[in-house]
Amino acid sequence: IKTKGFKIGLATSSPMALVDAVLARLNIGHYFAVRHSAEFEEYGKPHPAVYIQTATQLGFVPQECIAVEDSFNGLLAAKSATMKTIVIPEAINANNSRFSIADIQLSSLAELSADHLN
């Protein structure tokens, strides 16, 4: 995805200290142009603030962004921010109808392709 020229931002409810530690441990921090946590916002997910701020920091309006989520609260936050949404719920929740509000639902991150981002 990054090789296609997309900017990647991380909008999370997790504390930044934890996020930074995980990204460093996995050596994947360099993939993210922006990292932003709801801990710096007045409200966490499902409020859209963390997504709106991440889009702003990336230099985009939310309508130009695509959110990839795994949780229902995150999906609600991204939809409320007016982003296109791709959801990849845990297998146990894959058939839960509440995820049908997503624009695209996948079973695995491995299924995500550049075609989903058009």
Regions found by a protein language model. Name each.
Residues 1-10, 16-20:
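Short, acidic loop-to-helix structural element flanking the phosphoryl-transfer center
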Residues 10-11, 42:
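Residue-level "hotspot" positions that anchor or transmit function at local structural transition points
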Residues 16, 21-118:
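Asp-based, Mg2+/Mn2+-dependent phosphohydrolase catalytic module
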